[in-house]
């Protein structure tokens, strides 16, 4: 049985999603239903982002900078190391623009080395990063019963624990 989450507590976060395929979209739906504020979604396939944005009542960002600018917490659900490094690139459109005080929860299937690079890049701009490796499927993403293996600083984990509990 999924843990009951207090909706009042959930309003303190403004959450953005990068990667709204089957996993990311279902994670966004789940958080929205549990009372979290999902402010924006982004996908390289804009039609997919627009569809989920309309469904859950948020914005479909056209740039990664827009996601960071409108979110306290950004959850990334992309496919591989190359995609992850691309969304956190040092130049051009990137989640690192205006990222000071943003917390990133990276749920992508990527190598440990890439997680370390991303954490260093985030910290360099005043942001925080948490690794949130998933060992579950689409149904668990939708139902809020994901198995997440988290890595990162305890203070970052504690800050976003209500989100992690809901996922």
Regions found by a protein language model. Name each.
Residues 15, 110-167:
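Rossmann-fold dinucleotide-binding core
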Residues 38-39, 104, 129, 148:
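Hydrophobic/aromatic residues located in beta-strands of well-ordered beta-sheets
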Residues 64-128:
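Rossmann-fold NAD(P) dinucleotide-binding segment
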Residues 18, 63, 93, 135-138:
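Short beta-strand/turn micro-motifs at beta-sheet edges
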Residues 21, 42, 77, 108-111, ...:
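Short loop or secondary-structure boundary microenvironments that flank
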Residues 2-77, 102-103:
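NAD(P)+-binding Rossmann beta1-loop-alpha1 motif at the extreme N-terminus of oxidoreductases
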Residues 8-9, 97-98, 142:
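Short, flexible hinge/linker loops that cap or flank conserved catalytic cores
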